[in-house]
Amino acid sequence: MWFWIVCGLLLGGLVFMFAYTYPIARYVYFTQLVRTEPEKWDRACSAPENEEQLAMWNAGVEWAEQNRDKVTEVKIENDGFELYGEYFDFGADRCVIVLPGRCECLMYSYYFAPPYKEAGFNVLVIDTRCHGKSSGKYNTIGVKESSDVIAWSKLLHERFGNREVWYHGICIGTAAGIFAITDKKCPEYVKGFVTEGCFVSFRETFKRHMIQQKRPLFPVLDLVMLLINRYTGTNVYKDKPINAIKKIKKDARVLFLYGEHDVFSIPEKSRQLFGACSAEDKKLVWFDKGGHSHLRINNTEKYDREIVEFFKR
């Protein structure tokens, strides 16, 4: 009898816990990972209250205006989505696609373009699906966005004649790039990527976001991961950058840029991702200033120099 009483109490506790935490998980999921209205994740600074973020935005917009005569607006369709971008033609035969982080549009990506212009690249900035002018509602953590990245790569080669395509990813943007370059459908002319602050797994980095926001982790974190799977089909437990990067082709070239004080892609995990990368030509660079995705604003000269010198080799 006591056995059934204990089982009943445990079951009741689980039901109560689920009833209490599931609405929290839904709120977190739809707030952080779903474009619930067209104005969300639009072409606007995602955090104007953040001094560094606003400075990056303004500097990027200024750079784009200075190079406005070089830009062509582009659009593709992939996986049922209309996707928009801007192609800056500097007369080179290779191009970098800047892959922004979560909540960011193509205008955010302007900020990362200057070292590539200096290194002899054309530059493509894009509104990832469900951001900016691009259609879509659900963020798939880079997994399905990777097919969009491949489609953009083909446009650069077939329409604009770029001999090589490279990726520059910031946070979740790198995840899309890693999933793309390790996909069997990825063209041979995609040669490698530069990453700033990529995570080993989305669950790992999102856990740190939730801790910072003082949200309950158990069982909310894993309920959010299950909601991702329910609405997008993405299996966060399997589809991880640290798994995919082990399959990258040996002749790819990869530059890892990480901050010593990044609280979301922490140094310990960053070293694991670098170690797992199967590319023979890879380099890891550390920066002692700047938080997550804010390395260039705090180390502009070094950041740009590392990129330019990487492509001189």
Q: Across the structure, where does each feature detected by a protein language model lie?
A:
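Conserved alpha/beta-hydrolase "acid-adjacent" motif
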Residues: Y237, V263-K269
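An N-terminal hydrophobic leader/cap segment in hydrolases
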Residues: G8-I76
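Hydrolase active-site cap/lid region
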Residues: F179-V236
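Catalytic nucleophile-loop/oxyanion-hole region of alpha/beta-hydrolase
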Residues: H131-F160, E164
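Acidic catalytic loop of the alpha/beta-hydrolase fold
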Residues: E260-S265, S293-H294
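Conserved alpha/beta-hydrolase
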Residues: A113-S135
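Short beta-strand/loop motif that positions the catalytic acidic residue
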Residues: I248-D251, F256-Y258, D262
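Catalytic histidine-centered segment of alpha/beta-hydrolase-like enzymes
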Residues: G290-E301
